[in-house]
Regions:
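Catalytic center-proximal scaffold of phosphoryl-transfer enzymes
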Residues: 1-57, 97-526
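An N-terminal low-complexity regulatory-tail signal and nearby short nucleic-acid-interaction modules
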Residues: 56-119
Length: 526
């Protein structure tokens, strides 16, 4: 052990004594809980920095300075110790490593491989925390959170750059990820697709005007194609039960008794890309193929009435039953109700319930005939007749995909709530904040990492990413985690090993963490 390591150890012991005095000394007797908690957090960060610095110093101490052999059989002599900076959650730290070199061959730093360091200065933990925050918050707010919480200054550019680098392996991760166990799947395989516009910056913007004209915008929108695949258990419903639920009407007692618990999607996977419909559906088909099999009894494809999307869904999923999203169909009924009765008419809801029941009972052809006849009746205003004709035409074109009575009898889903929610939450809520404009590459990187987070693959993906990076940089397998390190990482609380620590003092026991709680899936909650 070098004198430098000994010095660091002495400083750590002094700082630990300071920690003890901070919580038990004379001044602590007059302090508030908030003062102690805030001060303790800062002191622990400083202590963590010293401990991590000691770790690096000791690893450098034990690293051999003897000449090394390269993979090609060449010999590199020890040249000097060289420094690199390491930005950790505890702050900026120096790492000194032995550097081996031979003129004409270049140099190597074996300790970088042993420590599994990346190409830049940011630690993997800091990257993962900032990126997890970044997929849900604007980048400058992510920097503000890190500054307030950890006292770190991470620029918006650094966050965006790290996300771009770490999103590069998402496609290969999902390509190698095995399909869910058939025993964990339900019998209905469902695919959904829809589009959502994302505001982009102009690639070659003209000279910006002093003031925008009416209708002018500083950017343009490009469609992000959002896709989803999952399995779900059959849930048989009647048209009337759906109407009762949809319009919040009070069901009868017998209907309540017969109503089953709501089925939930199993192993739902979502994705979004601006590369176009064909690229999105090709990838979706690749995801679907390994999940299909004898355990799947039904195959359903849900989308809205947009013809180009319907044609592509039929092309890429020919064995699936294409269903028009019932919510989109019902929106056309609402437009007719508003045109005929007005939004404040007391009988509008009753009219909607009546015609919705007809649609769900697969009597859409009768509704079409009624609307077409009304559209020819001159007693109605021109706008009313136009809306009747528009809705009738829409229903006529989508009639092959509107056999809702059969779908409900088989227990199939008829509404694309999963994909509608994904378009809103997955894309809109992050990409369409006020004044926000994206480059296509920037939003693709964000959406890839956002998909990893939303699909529940965050930790697994970053383990994969680190292994892939290690092979690229050092052409060797990623170092195995030692049992002691795994124990420290997996140990959520020292109180778990001392369950009587609280009860022995007459206090309520501290509950064990709930593995299902979202908090404990955050990178900081280890």
């Amino acid at each position: 052990m070098t004198s430098n390591s000994q010095t660091i150890i002495q400083e750590i012991r002094q700082e630990f004594e300071m920690l003890l005095d901070f919580v038990s000394g004379d001044q602590a007797q007059q302090a508030t809980a908030d003062q102690i908690e805030r001060g303790l957090f800062k002191l622990l960060l400083a202590l963590g920095a010293k401990l991590l610095l000691l770790f690096f110093a000791m690893r450098s101490d034990i690293c051999s300075r003897e000449a090394i052999s390269t993979a090609a059989g060449d010999t590199l002599a020890y040249e000097r110790d060289t420094k690199r900076n390491y930005y950790s959650i505890f702050g900026k730290l120096p790492i000194w490593r032995p550097y081996f070199y031979k003129p004409g061959l270049g140099g190597e730093i074996p300790l970088d491989a042993a420590l599994a360091l990346g190409e830049d200065s940011y630690s993997d933990l800091l990257r993962e925390i900032s990126e997890y925050l970044g997929v849900y918050n604007v980048y400058h707010k992510t920097g503000d959170i890190l500054a307030r919480l950890l006292g770190l200054k991470v620029s918006t550019g650094a966050i965006e750059s790290n996300m771009a680098e770490d999103a590069a392996d998402v496609e290969s991760y999902y390509a190698q990820k095995p399909a869910p166990d058939p025993a964990e799947e339900a019998e209905i395989l469902v695919v959904q697709a829809d589009g959502k516009g994302v505001p982009l910056v102009l690639e070659a913007p003209p000279e910006p005007p002093v003031r925008l004209g009416k209708g002018q915008k500083r950017g343009r929108k490009k469609e992000a194609m959002v896709t989803s695949v999952y399995t779900i258990a059959a849930q048989v419903r009647t048209p009337q039960s759906v109407v009762d639920s949809f319009f919040q009407q009070s069901p009868t007692a017998s209907a309540r008794q017969q109503s089953p618990s709501r089925s939930r999607p199993q192993h739902k996977q979502i994705w979004a890309t601006l590369a176009g419909k064909d690229a999105a559906l090709t990838r979706l088909a690749d995801q679907v193929a390994p999940r299909d099999g004898e355990h799947i009894g039904h195959r359903v494809a849900l989308c809205d009435g947009y013809e180009p999307l319907q044609r592509r869904m039929s092309k890429y999923f020919p064995d699936f039953t294409l269903i028009l999203d019932f919510i989109h169909a019902d929106e056309y009924l609402w437009e007719v109700a508003n045109a005929l009765l007005g939004e404040q008419h007391p009988q509008r809801l009753e009219w909607m319930a009546e015609y919705t029941l007809k649609i769900l009972s697969s009597q859409t052809d009768q509704v079409i005939a009624t609307f077409q006849q009304m559209a020819q009746d001159q007693q109605y205003k021109a706008k009313q007749r136009a809306q009747l004709a528009k809705t009738a035409t829409y229903f006529q074109r989508n009639l092959p995909y509107m056999d809702y009575a059969t779908y409900l009898k088989r227990g199939w889903p008829i509404a694309s709530g999963v994909i509608e929610g994904a378009c809103r939450h997955f894309v809109k809520d992050r990409c369409e904040l006020s004044g926000m404009r994206w480059t296509q590459l920037g939003v693709e990187n964000l959406l890839r990492l956002r998909a990893v987070a939303e699909n529940g693959d965050w930790d697994d993906y970053h383990q994969f990413r680190k292994r892939q990076r290690h092979r690229r940089l050092y052409d060797q397998p990623y170092p195995q985690q030692l049992p002691l390190e795994m124990q420290a990482i997996e140990n959520n609380s020292s109180f778990e090993s001392r369950p009587d620590a609280a009860t022995s003092q007459g206090l309520d026991p501290i509950p064990a963490p709930d593995d299902q709680a979202g908090y404990y899936h955050l990178p900081l909650a280890v």
